[in-house]
């Protein structure tokens, strides 16, 4: 089947919130999950005094003030290669919790605050726990500046909450040139 035709056929079967935007032939040993070189996630927070129904299910509603500049500075502590044991779901069966985060930042556009995280791989709930830790810093239940110590501790109880799934988006999957 030609790639272009396969892509059109896929899109007739996919739900409206998912679209195939490209398609190409790959070698037989290619695996969509295990052949990827990295991923980029975005966690969206609607930071406004009043809930916006158009963002329901697409972003976490957070009515308390957020200092995106402060959160961005804290998020930079996630950059690099670390043991992310403190930022994974308790009981996770992954043997090697070491991951490399090569992009991490917080931006604001109006009422929308976004955490963007890209890395070579992610543990279960890792991005949601990173987002929850930053939000807990904003409300004072996790000390500002404590991310390096939390990483070093490898202790899940030292990190913040697991932010709700509603704000999380897998934005891009990176593959090596085939």
Predicted features and spans:
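Structured-RNA-binding interfaces characteristic of tRNA pseudouridine synthases
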Residues: 1-178
């Amino acid at each position: 089947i030609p790639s272009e035709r396969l892509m059109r056929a896929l899109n007739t079967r996919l739900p409206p919130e998912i679209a195939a935007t490209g398609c190409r032939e790959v070698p037989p040993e290619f695996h969509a999950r295990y052949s990827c070189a990295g991923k980029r996630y975005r966690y969206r927070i609607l930071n406004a005094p009043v809930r916006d129904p158009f963002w329901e299910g697409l972003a976490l509603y957070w009515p308390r003030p957020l200092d995106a500049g402060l959160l961005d500075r804290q998020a930079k502590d996630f950059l690099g290669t670390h043991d992310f044991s403190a930022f994974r779901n308790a009981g996770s069966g992954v043997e090697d919790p070491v991951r490399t985060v090569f992009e991490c930042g917080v931006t604001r556009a109006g009422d929308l605050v976004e955490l963007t995280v890209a890395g070579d791989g992610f543990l279960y709930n890792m991005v949601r726990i990173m987002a929850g830790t930053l939000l807990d810093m904003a409300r004072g239940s996790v000390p500002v500046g404590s991310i390096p110590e939390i990483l070093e501790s490898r202790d899940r109880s030292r990190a913040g909450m697991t932010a709700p799934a509603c704000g999380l988006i897998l934005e891009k999957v990176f593959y090596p040139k085939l």
